[in-house]
Design a protein with these regions (language model features):
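N-terminal pre-ligand scaffold of iron-sulfur
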Residues: 412-497, 514-517, 522-529
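A Rossmann-like FAD-binding core segment of flavoenzymes
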Residues: 29, 76-94, 100, 166-262, ...
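Glycine-rich Rossmann-fold phosphate-binding loop(s) that bind the pyrophosphate
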Residues: 11-14, 37, 130-131, 151-156
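Short, well-ordered coil/turn residues at beta-beta hairpins
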Residues: 108-109, 151, 238-239, 250-251, ...
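Mid-to-C-terminal Rossmann-like scaffold of FAD/NAD(P)H-dependent oxidoreductases
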Residues: 2-6, 25, 278-377, 381, ...
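FAD-site-proximal beta/loop scaffold in flavoenzymes
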Residues: 122-145, 217-223, 228-304, 391-396, ...
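Beta1-alpha1 glycine-rich phosphate/pyrophosphate-binding loop at the start
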Residues: 2-75, 163-184, 378
Length: 529
């Protein structure tokens, strides 16, 4: 009699949850155990510094509705800490000594905020933003007129500052760099973000460190190394994160700036894999290890690791991607640039509608579109091509991006036409990442299904799930999951076509949930109301 296989995932994160989901989608019928130290089930992190922090999204940004795990026979064990791994016995120790056997082990333990060891660090009112509870605590204090000091001028610091200003707080950013985001974007693009924040009333103190927090029981002031004293009702610290590698290291798994894994996300110990923020993975395109701390990487790397667990995986070579919204400025960034020779701008920089490209040895290593949409796939194609480009042509908005990696002349023009992305759906101004996250935290319609009129359709909330409900002209109710089966965006009702459409990638479904056109391949799940 065959023994049931057990796959254990340590880390109830986005990467861990998507890995568990993928295992079932790929046909794994063994036991799946998903362990999470937090009390919450897996959730999305991007909203924690954006619309959820601002109070614009009340719903918690969970990855899956609560019934998902039981329905898919995934043992989700929250408030459960893994304390040890014994590779020789293939067991994970959890809780007070329980040993859980595994056939494959995936570590998605994520990262934790770096703490500031300065005087006053223990005062109340000093917050680090990483978990859902952190965002809740900060949000409660973002009242009009509150004096908020943000320590750190990276992505988290910049987004928290923007969210606080939109809640009418008085905001000061303190950063070691001369401009925000300088380490990632460089001084030229960082200066643009500095000006964006200043235009919205944020005070930026760059080139200075933190000396101490001051106050009685609560923080009252922040003192910088340059001698400035800043009054504060609330402090948010965002000075980077450190990968959680202690569990792996204690088991002899190689780690350096994360758990070291190959392009198949396999660690130095057979049967143990890693994905998400904690994985320092060899990247075939870049020819080196990279560790990526962004949402899209967790979304895509978790499923890739699941396929490797099933021995059906391929090399993970996705180009890193992230997005950010600050005030009325939205951006998408693709690539991985730790060094570059020049930054080339294309478009209206003063009007904040442009694309920036980071070039090294004439090749594009990263690109960022700011308030310009439908171009990120083209940017990624240029990065992946590894072809040297002409900087003057790159800066010229009249030169199609598709042509930039092609030789001049008729042959290049013909190849450009052949390789141009399809028009239509992608030309409608669609920003996948923003739509994906916004949809996941959106509050569904509160209309009871019994009140739907003939010919009416709505996405409604039913027991924590988002359901696409449509009552046809005969009064028959059709209820299906509102989550697109391609990549998890929410569908919307197309009144003209009487279909459920996904505006992330263009999938379309009949009211019954049957796929009309892809990229989705699976029908929407039927729901009984």
């Amino acid at each position: 009699m065959a023994t049931e296989r057990i796959f254990v995932i340590v880390g109830a994160s986005l990467a861990g949850a998507k890995a568990a989901e993928t295992l079932r989608e790929e046909g794994f019928d063994g036991r799946i155990v998903l362990l999470g130290a937090e009390a919450e089930r897996p959730y999305e992190r991007p909203p924690l510094s954006k619309d959820y922090l601002r109070g614009e999204a009340e719903a918690k940004p969970y990855v899956h509705p609560e019934p998902f795990y039981a329905e898919n026979e995934i043992e989700l064990r929250t408030s459960t800490t893994a304390t040890g791994i014994d590779p020789s016995a293939s067991t994970v120790t959890i809780g007070e000594g329980e040993r859980l056997p595994y056939d494959r082990l995936l570590l998605t333990t994520g990262a934790e905020p770096r703490r500031l060891p300065v005087p006053g660090a223990e005062l109340e009112g000093i917050h680090y933003l990483r978990e859902l509870g952190n965002s809740d605590a900060i949000r409660d204090r973002l009242t009009a007129g509150a004096r908020v000091v943000v320590i750190g001028a990276g992505w988290i610091g910049a987004e928290v500052a923007a969210s606080a200003r939109e809640r009418d707080c008085e905001v000061t950013i303190v950063g070691m760099a001369s401009v925000p985001l300088e380490r990632v974007l460089g001084p030229e693009v960082g200066a643009i973000y500095r000006d964006i924040h200043r235009d919205h009333g944020v005070r930026f103190l760059g080139g200075t460190g933190l000396e101490a927090f001051e106050g009685a029981a609560r923080v009252e002031r922040v003192r910088t190394s340059s001698g400035a004293s800043i009054d504060a009702d609330l402090v948010v610290v965002g000075v980077g994160v450190a990968p959680r590698v202690e569990l792996a290291e204690s088991a002899g798994i190689e780690a350096e700036n994360g758990i070291l894994v190959n392009e198949h996300l396999q660690s130095s110990v057979p049967g143990v894999l890693a994905a998400g923020d904690v994985a320092n993975a060899h990247h075939p395109l870049y020819g080196r290890r990279i560790r990526v701390e962004h949402w899209a990487n967790a979304l895509e790397q978790g499923p890739a690791a699941a396929r490797s667990m099933l021995d059906t995986g391929v090399a993970y070579d996705n180009i890193p991607y992230f997005f950010s919204d600050q005030y009325d400025v939205g951006m998408e960034y693709a690539g991985y640039a730790t060094s570059w020779d020049e930054v080339v701008f294309r478009g209206d920089v003063k009007g904040r509608e442009f694309i920036a490209f980071w070039l090294e040895s004439g090749r594009i290593v990263a690109g960022m579109n700011v308030n310009v949409w439908d171009v990120n796939e083209r940017i990624r194609a240029l990065i992946r091509s590894r072809t040297p480009v002409d900087a003057k042509r790159l800066a010229d908005p009249d030169v199609p991006l598709e042509e930039l990696a092609l030789p001049p002349g008729p042959a290049g023009e013909e190849r450009s036409r052949a390789s141009a992305p399809p028009q239509g759906f992608l030309a409608q101004g669609i920003n996948f990442a923003k739509r994906f996250v916004a949809a996941r935290v959106a509050t569904p319609d509160a209309t009871p299904v019994s009140e739907l009129r003939n010919g009416e359709a709505k996405v409604i909330g039913v027991d924590g799930e988002k359901v696409a409900a449509y009552r046809d002209g005969d009064g028959t109710l059709h209820a299906v999951s509102a989550v697109c089966t391609h990549m998890g965006c929410l569908v919307e009702w197309n009144e003209d076509e009487e279909t459920w459409d996904c505006h992330c990638h263009g999938s379309r479904f009949e009211p019954s949930g049957r796929v009309i056109n892809g990229p989705a391949k699976k029908d929407l799940e039927q729901k009984q109301l």
